[in-house]
């Protein structure tokens, strides 16, 4: 009876760990059942560098890496170079994988610890009106591309608004200062103010909720979000 209880407890722990694995969840978003084709092992590296190893084949390929982002990057490597699949920011070509996966034995490592992504202009040109579904997709693609230090600028305008109000600015003055979403990049670089505004109150609430989801997912992967600091500009 005791042995059965220990076994049941162990299986429960495994199930919980699988459910909490962001790479497994990402693979299911890419294609139903895809997570079953990869075994993911997270192990630290003695030389303190990022790495991934691929080995096995047939029913399942094992991916060993020092973190979730490295594991996701390794899976993307395998899909691209062994399964001739393509998952990218511009679209996917991801057919059903063969019953017998191609055999593989590879190891790749890097001494580069910070892989930064995005800039202010890209943020405003591209992401200004994204919802959670689109951001979820983008964060998955970041992981598949090995990115571990993404910009996290969503909702910065809410921080500006709250801070200025606490410093005694009136709400009309704050609204006059902040620009519209398509111009946030230039506001955050200190280049302009007011253009495209004012923003409705509901916008700030929605962006705060969205940013919390974005940060939670980035941190699940082990990414280090980059936030906006104060650069000396005031109304």
Q: What label would you give each PLM region?
A:
Residues 9, 74, 235:
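Active-site-proximal flexible loops/turns
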Residues 19-112:
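Contiguous, structured surface segment used for ligand recognition
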Residues 4-14:
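Sec-dependent N-terminal signal peptides
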Residues 12-13, 77, 230:
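Alpha-helical transmembrane segments and their juxtamembrane interfaces
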Residues 42-45, 57-64, 68, 93-94, ...:
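Aromatic-lined carbohydrate-binding surfaces of glycoside hydrolases
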Residues 2-4, 85-89, 147-152:
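Short secondary-structure capping/junction motifs at helix and strand boundaries
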Residues 16-19, 235:
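Short, intrinsically disordered, charge-balanced linker/junction segments flanking boundaries
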